[in-house]
Amino acid sequence: MKAFLHHLQNEAKLIISLTYCVDGEFALNEIARATLQQYGIVQLSSATNSDSETEAATSKAVKTAYDKAVEAKTTADGKVGLNGNESINGEKTFENRIVAKRNIRISDSPHYASRGDYLNIGANNGDCWFEYKLSNQEIGTLRMHANGDLTYKRQKIYLKMDCWQAIHKRKLKVFTAKRKKR
């Protein structure tokens, strides 16, 4: 019998009838354990976190791993990607800050976002701005320049008193260069 099994292993085939094993013709411990290099007896396992090379995964383990992969993909598909353009539906909360390389555009509908935005917020090394548009026409831009100037529609805004005092005293009076002083 041992010679017969040895011959089968050399031929890279091991065919054993279960009834032959049950009848007691030979002991199961005479058959080698299967490895990556040789045929033999394999232990089945339903574990999905095993890295064993001497155990084979059952269909239950494969299904569990597959279900977890599908769940992870579904979760990942619901996340905002780091690259490319995406449409985001629903409300998103950002706990930290939003960093944009060029500018931030805000619109209340995709229709206006594609034609022109209601509000365009931007900044560069020279200034920052809030630009308001309606029907793709600029209504006005409030701009803070790097030198500290504040302008609206390209006209400098002057304050009659210090901003901090004006806000706390609620006496803020604003006028532009076009308005005549009284």
From Swiss-Prot:
Under the heading Pfam families, the entry gives: Phage_fiber_2
A biological process (GO) annotation for this entry? Answer: virion attachment to host cell
Could you tell me which species this protein originates from?
A: Haemophilus influenzae (strain ATCC 51907 / DSM 11121 / KW20 / Rd)
Task: List, alphabetically, the InterPro entries matched.
Answer: Phage_lambda_Stf-r2
Protein's UniProt name: Uncharacterized protein HI_1403
Q: Its domain of life? A: Bacteria
